[in-house]
Amino acid sequence: MKALVRVAVTGAAGQIGYSLLFRIAAGEMFGKDRSVILQMLELPDEKAQAALKGVMMELEDCAFPLLAGMVVTDNPDIAFKDADAALLVGSRPRGPGMERKDLLMENAKIFTAQGAALNKVARRDVKVLVVGNPANTNAYIAMKSAPDLNPKHFTAMLRLDHNRALSQLSTKLSKPVANIEKLIVWGNHSPTMYPDYRFATADGTPIIEAINDQAWNANSFIPTVSKRGAAIIEARGLSSAASAANAAIDHMRDWLLGSNGKWITMGVPSDGSYGIPEGMIFGFPVTTTNGEYSIVKDLPIDTFSKTYIDKTLAELEEERASIAHLLR
């Protein structure tokens, strides 16, 4: 059995948290040979803490062999103590009549505090995944609030967008998702993201040979992927939870255990690749090995792609500018 792993999960009693915790405890994120301690954070109000205790009771009742312990708390310093991994799921949702800039400001307060707590008490090599929206900018805020931690270890979740795009291509091609490789989602986890299959293959054959249809790409594929979250809310009355939790599992598992040479999409701090400003958390194609990721370099960016990448970059720059005064 490998060393015990401590994983902190914020918003632990929420819909995504509920879909996530049982799968972590079953060994789906860190492997079937690693015991886990779940360190669960929720809001300090009575209702949220009662719900969290109920989740803990259910986890106990599963008798997971790999679940070595649990902590439930409303204190980030306790939840993040010695954490090897931190999944920042909880965020302020957008309320009726709330402007996007108001949402950014509310979440900036949360992620400044959580970044500072991670900086204070987490392991120095902690790996952080931000799921709570707006995920890229929240990850940027947490990273900037944790100056003593490795900035490369602050990431945002674009894997849900990646998986959604994969599924759409699978349906279009009548091919299993497992046979499709080298798909990319560029940019922000928002409707401006750019799913890009120019380099993707199915059974080793370039997909653009099978789908050489820019009208389908622009008018069907990209809008379907970018608006999928809204379509699920309309159909279900609630936002994506199980699929978001599944994407978080995929993201962390591949980061920690390796992608075996396959391209995956992660929101990571830019190193200046593709003209994206250094430090901006942006969706890139990466490969992972030994717990570290590398951005896939030197892919050609055509005019069509540049238009979409510039649009998602502009949105991220606007978000970053709106919270810059909070990070001084």
Swiss-Prot record:
Active site per UniProt: 189
Catalytic reactions of this protein: (S)-malate + NAD(+) = oxaloacetate + NADH + H(+)
Its job: Catalyzes the reversible oxidation of malate to oxaloacetate.
GO biological process: malate metabolic process; tricarboxylic acid cycle
Taxonomic superkingdom: Bacteria
EC id: 1.1.1.37
Keywords: NAD, Oxidoreductase, Tricarboxylic acid cycle
Amino-acid positions noted as binding substrate in the UniProt annotation, renumbered to this chain: 94, 100, 133, 164
Gene Ontology MF annotations: L-malate dehydrogenase (NAD+) activity
Binding site for NAD(+): 11-17, 107, 114, 131-133
Protein name according to UniProt: Malate dehydrogenase
